[in-house]
A protein has these predicted regions:
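C-terminal motif of bacterial Sec signal peptides marking the signal peptidase cleavage site
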Residues: 16-19
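Conserved structural position at the C-terminal beta-strand
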Residues: 154-156
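Surface-exposed, short loops/turns at beta-strand junctions within beta-sandwich domains
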Residues: 140-149
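Short beta-strand segments within Ig-like beta-sandwich modules, predominantly Fibronectin type-III
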Residues: 128-135
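Mature extracytoplasmic domains of secretory-pathway proteins
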Residues: 52-120
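Bacterial signal peptide processing site
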Residues: 21-23
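Edge beta-strands of extracellular beta-sandwich domains
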Residues: 160-173
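Positively charged n-region of N-terminal signal peptides that target proteins for export
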Residues: 1-7
Length: 181
């Protein structure tokens, strides 16, 4: 009788665990962004503002909205990640950076640029910079080779998660380089 009871309990346990197969991780917030320049200097950026929702796995969804500071907010200047940019030998020289969101490549990415003199001026107009998706899911963009503030706007639309996020970093002049990159 004990053997039959033990066997029944074991079967019940196995059946209950069968429904607990490996679950796919669902992104519950926007991923971090890694920005790398051609000289392999990089900076990791978390999203400041986002609108995000994701599947709970039971037919329901959940989400969050985070309203971060404006990219030019003077109070955020000291905590904004800084990517060292080489000094150009030509005023017309642009630098390519790679935007990597890990395993969660967005559907679209665009950038906005402001001069470093715009810190604190939240009414300043930005310049648009396009980003091009690569085969590996990263994006590349040509940045203006000067001190400045860059906002990366990304959007996702998958069955498991969707939303928009803004990432901000600053470019700072570094060592001189010559030739094309």
């Amino acid at each position: 009788m004990k053997r039959l009871l033990s066997t029944c309990l074991l079967c019940a346990l196995l059946l209950s665990l069968a429904g607990c197969g490996a679950k796919k991780d669902v992104l519950t917030a926007p991923p971090e962004l890694s920005v790398t320049n051609a000289q392999d200097a990089s900076v990791t950026v978390s999203s400041g503002s986002y609108d995000w929702n994701y599947a709970l796995g039971n037919g329901e969804r959940s989400g969050a909205i985070a309203c971060g500071a404006h990219p030019l907010d003077e109070n955020c200047r000291d905590i904004t990640p800084v990517l060292e940019m080489p000094i150009a030998v030509s005023a017309s020289h642009f630098y390519v950076v790679t935007l990597d969101f890990g395993d969660c490549a967005p559907d679209s990415v665009s950038l906005r640029y402001w001069s470093g003199t715009c810190w604190g001026d939240t009414e300043a107009q930005s310049e648009a910079i396009s980003a091009e998706r690569q085969d590996d899911g990263t994006y590349t963009a040509e940045l203006i080779p000067s001190v400045g503030i860059f906002a990366v706007d990304a959007s996702w639309n998958t069955d498991d998660y969707q939303g928009r996020a803004c990432y901000v970093f600053a470019g700072e002049s570094g060592g001189a380089v010559s030739g094309g990159q």
